A protein has these predicted regions:
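Bacterial N-terminal signal peptides
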Residues: 10-19
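Glycine-rich, small/hydroxylated-residue low-complexity segments
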Residues: 25-484
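Positively charged n-region of N-terminal signal peptides that target proteins for export
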Residues: 1-4
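C-terminal motif of bacterial Sec signal peptides marking the signal peptidase cleavage site
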Residues: 21-23
């Protein structure tokens, strides 16, 4: 019996030793409750300059997520943003923005200092810009404005890969540093939003209340960025990467795409409707990337829209002008060399740094010197401007536009052509002649312009050509003839 007792006691002693020895000399980690994690997050966000968030414990919901992270939901938080607390480079007063949100969801890992914005429900932002703009304009010696307000509301928004971790360590950072941190964290992210409204109000010179309201049923955005290049514009001490190597890699520095559906715009004066418009669908993309040969950079945008309709009660001619079934527009600035882009980025970076120091005279001198470098590299690049509209389907007919000009030197206009193709010209002119909504003056003016400047071929198609030539600088040609 004694032997059995001592054996059991020995086993128990060894077991306790194995449990206790690894923890000797260590402090026991405090495990926080879910609600304490949420409260700590709110407290940390309140340390962001200008940001104030209040949320009652009963309105906080904490759920487990993947990778031992938390899903933290704040219901009906009270949020205020004071722009005057941000380092904008100008003195700002009365710049508080009130933000109401029904629900905001974060994904959070306090150990990794990670914070992601997941979704927002029922947002309302209200801002009286009068004080902000007046102060900003007065700093530039201009007269202030009155009665300027903006309201932004949104039914919901869902975010994918939107990392806002820089807010967890923003207490001592200025705006430019935060922008750089956000760019570094968000090389690629997506947003899907519904029921968005932008309401801009202001007083006209005659003290009439003007209201411009933009409603968007659905909107999606996608952004991809090569952060190493863009971050260097905002972060102090961060050098630009070798842009020649960036060209060889063939990766876009910035690629932004946005699409919207059921877009409505209305303009009112003293609550009386001046005009409105609708677009069934629109898509916009903005890019800055290497060309197909990886030899030069291209900067530009694309814009497509379907079914634009305007309603202007007191001007039927504007309604007709805005009756567009379909339009596709492209613009690009091409042949941009790596040295030119570097000189431009150097100027942007220097402007950011000098703006923060408020040494305006020194900034101006630096800009003048760097501007000469930019001009020199610009001409060495021999950049080309390209613009096109196709398709363009209007109430009266169709047309296509092609523009291609190249800068060869600073002392002469760019060389190239702008061509407008108009199929079935006579059919369009017949429709214009019979349009009762047009005034006699407008109708006769359009018919006269077409007859005078639109040559028509044997197939009934018209072509208008404007050009400049390298061998005749300073002379402009319309349809092959010099313009006198």
């Amino acid at each position: 019996m004694k032997r059995h007792f001592f054996l059991s006691a020995s086993i128990l002693s060894v077991s306790l030793a194995l449990l206790l020895i690894p923890n000797c000399g260590k402090h026991r980690e405090t495990v926080k409750t879910d609600m304490e994690v949420a409260a700590d997050l709110v407290q940390t966000l309140n340390e962001v300059p200008g940001l104030s968030i209040k949320s009652e414990p009963g309105n906080m919901i904490v759920e487990p997520s993947e990778k031992n992270r938390y899903l933290i939901t704040l219901k009906d938080p009270a949020i205020d943003l004071d722009i005057s607390k941000l380092n904008l480079g100008i003195p700002v007063k009365n710049a508080k923005i009130s933000i109401k949100i029904k629900e905001i969801v974060f994904k959070h890992d306090p150990r990794e200092k990670y914070l992601e914005l997941v979704s927002i429900r029922e947002l309302l932002l209200e801002w009286d810009l009068t004080g902000f703009l007046s102060t900003a304009l007065q700093a530039k010696g201009k007269q202030g404005l009155q009665g300027i307000t903006i309201k932004i509301s949104m039914g919901k928004a869902d975010f994918k890969n939107y990392d806002i971790s820089p807010l967890l360590d923003a207490k001592t950072k200025d705006l430019m540093e935060l922008v750089g941190d956000f760019l570094e964290r968000n090389q690629s992210h997506e947003t899907a939003a519904e029921h968005i409204t932008y309401d801009l109000g202001f007083l006209s010179k005659e003290h009439k209340k003007i209201s411009i309201v933009l409603d968007i049923e659905k909107m999606q955005t996608r952004q991809n960025a090569l952060s190493d290049v863009l971050i260097s514009l905002y972060k102090k001490g961060r050098e630009l990467p070798d842009l020649s190597k960036v060209l060889v890699q063939g990766k876009a520095l910035l690629d932004l795409a946005m699409s919207s559906s059921a877009v409505k715009l209305s303009v009112k004066e003293n609550e009386n409707l001046l005009g409105s418009g609708t677009i069934d669908h629109t898509a916009f993309s903005y890019f800055f990337k290497p060309d197909e040969t990886n030899s030069f950079f291209i900067y530009g945008f694309k814009w497509n829209m379907e079914n634009l309709k305007l309603s202007v009660p007191n001007n039927k001619e504007i309604e007709l002008a805005g009756n567009i079934e379909q339009m596709g527009m492209k613009f690009s600035l091409e042949n941009l060399s790596a040295p030119f882009i570097k000189s431009y980025f150097d100027l942007v970076k220097k402007s950011h740094e000098m703006s923060a120091s408020m040494d305006k005279e020194k900034l101006h001198q630096e800009q003048m010197t760097m501007g000469l470098t930019i001009a020199s590299e610009f001409i060495k690049s021999k950049p080309a401007v390209k613009f096109s509209i196709s398709p363009f389907k209007h109430h009266f007919g169709e047309l296509q536009v092609e523009v291609n000009f190249q800068f060869l030197n600073l002392m002469a206009p760019p060389v190239g052509k702008a061509v407008v193709h108009i199929p079935a010209v006579n059919k369009i002119l017949t429709k214009i002649a019979g349009e009762k909504s047009l005034s006699d003056k407008t109708r006769e003016g359009l018919l006269k312009l077409a007859k005078q400047y639109v040559p028509v071929d044997e197939n009934g198609n018209g072509t208008v050509t404007f050009e400049t030539r390298q061998d005749q600088p300073g002379t402009f040609f319309l349809n092959g003839k010099p313009i006198k």
